[in-house]
Every structure is written in C-alpha cells, then in structure tokens.
Amino acid sequence: MLPEEQLQRLYLAGFELATFDRFPKAVGVLRDNCVAFLVPGPDGLQILGNVGWRMGESLGPLVERQGRKVFVHKGEIVEATPERILTLERFRRDLKAILNERKS
C-alpha cells in the first residue's frame, strides 16, 4: 500500500497526523495521548523506534524503573497506570493493523 493510502486510512480510523520539528523526516501519528513516528520503508510506512506516551514534543517509551512501569523522556516521568498501558497497547495494535493492511 502506498504511504498516502496508509495515512488516509490512519486519519479515517481516528488517528491525528502531525509534524514535529525534532523529527523532520517522520510523520507523527497520535491518538489518546499515544504517539508514534512513521517513516517511509520498502513496503510503505513503518514505525520509527517505539510507540509511546506523548511528552511535550516527543515520545516517552514505556520502561521499568525501580520495579514499576513508567513513561520517560529526558528527566520527566509519567506513571504507566494500567489504563495508560491498555491505551498504548490498543494504539500499537490498531496502528500496526492499518500499516500491515494490503490493498485489496
């Protein structure tokens, strides 16, 4: 599927598309405070790095610190509550499903 078709499907599925100065070659995809950066790949758009929690103009990946799950970006920490983890998992699942769709 062409990148523009993937972006259209993401938009129609309720994802917000944005640009970020820190990632000029990527398209930011947001929903429910989750974010991923997409870049062109050999088979269409692909996720750059991890998906994570939006923290300012960047992404806080889910990590474990001192026995608890948190989202971290630079010195900032956001608690990874069970609700936030479920939201992130749903975001990742829905995003990957659309990116992996083949044109029928």
Enumerate the language-model features and the residues they cover.
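Negatively charged, low-complexity tracts enriched in Asp/Glu with abundant Ser/Thr
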Residues: 1-32, 101-104
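N-terminal non-globular leader segments, chiefly Sec-dependent signal peptides
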Residues: 7, 68-104
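Hydrophobic beta-strand residues in large extracellular and virion-surface proteins
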Residues: 10, 15-17, 27-29, 36-38, ...
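Serine/threonine-rich low-complexity intrinsically disordered regions
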Residues: 2-3, 19, 41, 58, ...
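Intrinsically disordered, low-complexity regulatory segments enriched in Ser/Thr/Pro
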Residues: 35-79
